[in-house]
């Protein structure tokens, strides 16, 4: 599939994935709205989009998201962001769909499939059958015959009547249509402020566009409630043994002594007969830990981001460096699970200041004290450390990233 911006031929079939909702019925989550909740190690929306990315019958994809969700979207999609056109949605699903259809106008597809972003189990077989049933004057609606007995209630909550279920179907998505007629139908509804249609087939019906019903898929469920998401996650984890993306980075730094009256280690000033020589504040512990965090993203080292040749970092507090590295980790969805710093030094003694260093690292990284380890050892009077010419530090960071280790 080509990125829309690079398309050189008219697309035959496009897909609009509607994912701009707030998902209030699914409850609140630190991961964001339900389309960004994780099932089987990946975001719901990422799994939904993958079905269309992998479908050779689909030429172009537009995804409609909430204006506030761009960071969540990029974090969820990662590698596939460049192949999909992203547009901001509106206040309702109907308005978001219209905006998605409008985004395709310059690419003039012959047909368009419109799909809920929270139906992550759409199959290649269903997509194929939808395409096989497309016609220039008809839409296609996957649906399942209603199997439950339907009751209509009276105003007092008692049963008024049993509704015959013969000929009744539960609609699914993707719903597919000739592109121009369904866009025109949405534009007409918008022009007269009609926003009460519950799906695109209803708008097509309103405009006398024939819609053919085909058999849907029982697996093609919509994730509406928090329990739906939990069940989807359980289902995927039963079907697939995944290896979480846990990464470990190491860092090493050394600074020599020069005349002075204190050293700064892990953000804590410690009185000493000398200070450490460096372009910044020479905090050897934070420098090593900054490199360790950057290593978990393959993001170079501290010199890449803060070159010692740059005068703006002269005398700078190393807190700036480690918070920058932590932000890089978090922007990629990473969670810092553990950090460990070992100082190699004859003096000063680290033990009396360990608690203060731990507290400082907790504040800089936003993690609990039991995820921070600070240790020290001597060099048994060997080498430059043994001669009290400087201090070295070794740091290790463990970070958990979204997704899993690829096979």
From Swiss-Prot:
Entry binding sites for 4-CDP-2-C-methyl-D-erythritol 2-phosphate: 253-255, 279-280, 301-303, 377-380, 384, 387
Catalytic activity of the protein: 2-C-methyl-D-erythritol 4-phosphate + CTP + H(+) = 4-CDP-2-C-methyl-D-erythritol + diphosphate; 4-CDP-2-C-methyl-D-erythritol 2-phosphate = 2-C-methyl-D-erythritol 2,4-cyclic diphosphate + CMP
Site (Transition state stabilizer): 25, 34, 279, 378
Site feature (Positions MEP for the nucleophilic attack) residues: 165, 222
Swiss-Prot/TrEMBL cofactor(s): a divalent metal cation
Gene3D superfamilies named among the record's database cross-references: 2-C-methyl-D-erythritol 2,4-cyclodiphosphate synthase, Spore Coat Polysaccharide Biosynthesis Protein SpsA, Chain A
Pfam families per UniProt: IspD, YgbB
Protein keywords: Isoprene biosynthesis, Lyase, Metal-binding, Multifunctional enzyme, Nucleotidyltransferase, Transferase
Molecular function per GO: 2-C-methyl-D-erythritol 2,4-cyclodiphosphate synthase activity; 2-C-methyl-D-erythritol 4-phosphate cytidylyltransferase activity; metal ion binding
Stretches for region 2-C-methyl-D-erythritol 4-phosphate cytidylyltransferase: 1-246
BP term (GO), one: terpenoid biosynthetic process
Superkingdom assignment: Bacteria
Pathway: Isoprenoid biosynthesis; isopentenyl diphosphate biosynthesis via DXP pathway; isopentenyl diphosphate from 1-deoxy-D-xylulose 5-phosphate: step 2/6; Isoprenoid biosynthesis; isopentenyl diphosphate biosynthesis via DXP pathway; isopentenyl diphosphate from 1-deoxy-D-xylulose 5-phosphate: step 4/6
Start and end residues of each stretch annotated as 2-C-methyl-D-erythritol 2,4-cyclodiphosphate synthase: 247-407
EC number: 2.7.7.60, 4.6.1.12
Binding site for a divalent metal cation: 253, 255, 287
CDD domains reported for this sequence: CDP-ME_synthetase, MECDP_synthase
Function, as annotated: Bifunctional enzyme that catalyzes the formation of 4-diphosphocytidyl-2-C-methyl-D-erythritol from CTP and 2-C-methyl-D-erythritol 4-phosphate (MEP) (IspD), and catalyzes the conversion of 4-diphosphocytidyl-2-C-methyl-D-erythritol 2-phosphate (CDP-ME2P) to 2-C-methyl-D-erythritol 2,4-cyclodiphosphate (ME-CPP) with a corresponding release of cytidine 5-monophosphate (CMP) (IspF).
Protein family according to the UniProt entry: In the N-terminal section; belongs to the IspD/TarI cytidylyltransferase family. IspD subfamily.
Cross-referenced NCBIfam families: ispD, ispF, PRK09382.1
Protein name: Bifunctional enzyme IspD/IspF
Gene responsible for this protein: ispDF
């Amino acid at each position: 599939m080509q990125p829309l911006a690079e398309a050189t031929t008219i697309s035959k079939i496009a897909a609009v994935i509607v994912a701009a909702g707030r998902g209030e019925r699914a409850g609140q989550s630190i991961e964001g709205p339900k389309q960004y909740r994780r099932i089987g190690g990946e975001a719901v929306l990422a799994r939904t989009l993958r079905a269309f990315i992998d479908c050779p019958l689909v030429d172009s994809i537009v995804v409609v998201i909430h204006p506030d969700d761009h960071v969540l979207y990029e974090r969820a999609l990662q590698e596939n962001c460049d192949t999909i056109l992203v547009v901001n949605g509106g206040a309702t699903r109907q308005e978001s769909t219209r905006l998605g259809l409008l985004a395709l106008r310059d690419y003039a597809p012959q047909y368009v499939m419109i799909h809920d972003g929270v139906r992550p189990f759409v199959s290649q077989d269903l997509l194929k059958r939808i395409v096989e049933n497309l016609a220039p004057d008809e839409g296609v609606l996957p649906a399942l015959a209603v199997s439950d007995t339907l009751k209509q209630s009276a105003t007092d909550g008692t049963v008024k009547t049993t509704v015959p279920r013969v000929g009744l179907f539960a609609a699914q998505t993707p719903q597919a249509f000739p592109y121009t007629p369904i866009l025109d139908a949405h534009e007409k509804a918008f022009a007269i402020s009609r926003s009460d249609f519950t799906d695109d087939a209803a708008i097509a019906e309103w405009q006398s566009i024939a819609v053919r019903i085909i058999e849907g898929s029982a697996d093609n469920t919509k994730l509406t409630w928090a329990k739906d998401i939990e069940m989807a996650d359980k289902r995927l984890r039963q079907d697939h043994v995944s290896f979480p993306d846990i990464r470990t980075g190491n860092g090493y730094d050394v600074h020599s002594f020069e005349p002075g009256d204190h050293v700064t280690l892990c953000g804590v000033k410690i009185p000493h007969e000398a200070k450490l020589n460096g372009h910044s504040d020479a905090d050897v512990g934070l420098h090593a830990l900054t490199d360790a965090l950057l290593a978990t993203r393959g993001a170079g080292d501290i010199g890449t981001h803060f070159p010692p040749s740059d005068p703006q970092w002269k005398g700078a507090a190393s807190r700036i460096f480690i918070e920058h590295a932590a932000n890089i980790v978090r922007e990629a969805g990473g969670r810092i699970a553990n950090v460990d710093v070992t100082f190699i030094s004859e003096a000063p003694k680290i033990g009396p200041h360990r608690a203060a260093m731990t507290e400082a690292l907790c504040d800089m990284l936003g993690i609990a004290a039991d995820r921070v380890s600070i240790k020290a050892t001597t060099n048994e009077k060997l080498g430059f450390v043994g001669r009290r010419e400087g201090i070295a530090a070794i740091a290790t960071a463990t970070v958990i990233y979204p997704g899993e280790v690829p096979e």
